[in-house]
Swiss-Prot record:
Signal peptide boundaries: none
MF terms (GO), sorted A to Z: 3-oxoacyl-[acyl-carrier-protein] reductase (NADPH) activity; NAD binding; NADP binding
Entry binding sites for substrate: S141
Protein name, as recorded: 3-oxoacyl-[acyl-carrier-protein] reductase FabG
Length: 246
């Protein structure tokens, strides 16, 4: 098993890409600290993970609440002694064209998608530094690379995640901590289910492979970056988009 003995913290762990990653990590023997804002979704996740080789340990976690993050991270380290892998996956959308976007919608997306990644990473990294080992995987988006009309806030947040990924890769390499990002395209998740049919058709027409991706396909790449198989990979942004950005 590729993550046997590893303690892995995943945010946004109870739906979409986060859920698929949590279940895959548990299948690969990890102890998964599943952080999510929804207790109901966490309860469902734990039931689904029953019988897997690893373990799912759920925590209600809001990535905008620094006090709560600190408390959860301290509890995890006290209980398990370490955090080997961090997957920053929690994210939201509040779409609108630039001239119609409300300031509160800008703030909400930036606070979760960008500052939330900063918040959790800043709390976890000191323990990885003490261990002199760790892998951080940030979930960005192809929208952070090429932009998308109606997603000023989302594009800015995901571009910022890429910038932080590359900066942290340089800062932390000397402590044997690797930092990478994935940039999913259109993936079948609760977030993309909200797309109008016309928008879905337009998106599909731009994807060379002719379909939306599955959360499990993103999870497989996150697993590679989290595992020792990618021990010489850091500062990279891996597109998982069916050829969208070719």
């Amino acid at each position: 098993m590729r993550l046997e003995g590893k303690v892995c913290l995943i945010t946004g762990a109870a739906s979409g890409i986060g859920k698929a990653t949590t279940l895959l990590f548990a299948q690969e023997g990890a102890t998964v600290i599943a952080g999510d804002i929804s207790k109901e979704n966490l309860d469902s996740l734990v039931k689904e993970a029953e019988g897997l080789p690893g373990k799912v340990d759920p925590y209600v976690l809001n990535v905008t609440d620094r006090d709560q993050i600190k408390e959860v991270v301290e509890k995890v380290v006290q209980k398990y002694g370490r955090i080997d892998v961090l997957v920053n996956n929690a994210g939201i959308t509040r779409d609108a064209l630039l001239v119609r976007m409300k300031e509160e919608d800008w703030d909400a997306v930036i606070n979760v998608n960008l500052k939330g990644v900063f918040n959790v990473t800043q709390m976890v990294v000191p323990y990885m530094i003490k261990q002199r080992n760790g892998s951080i995987v940030n979930v960005s988006s192809v929208v952070g690379i090429y932009g998308n009309p109606g997603q000023t806030n989302y594009a800015a947040s995901k571009a910022g995640v890429i910038g932080m990924t590359k900066t942290w890769a340089k800062e932390l390499a000397g402590r044997n901590i690797r930092v990478n990002a994935v940039a999913p395209g259109f993936i079948e998740t609760p977030m993309t289910e909200k797309l109008p049919e016309k928008a879905r058709e337009t998106a599909l027409s731009r994807i060379p492979l002719g379909r939306f991706g599955k959360p499990e396909e993103v999870a497989q790449v996150i697993l590679f970056l989290a595992s020792d198989e990618s021990s010489y990979v850091t500062g990279q942004v891996i597109g998982i988009d069916g050829g969208l950005v070719i």
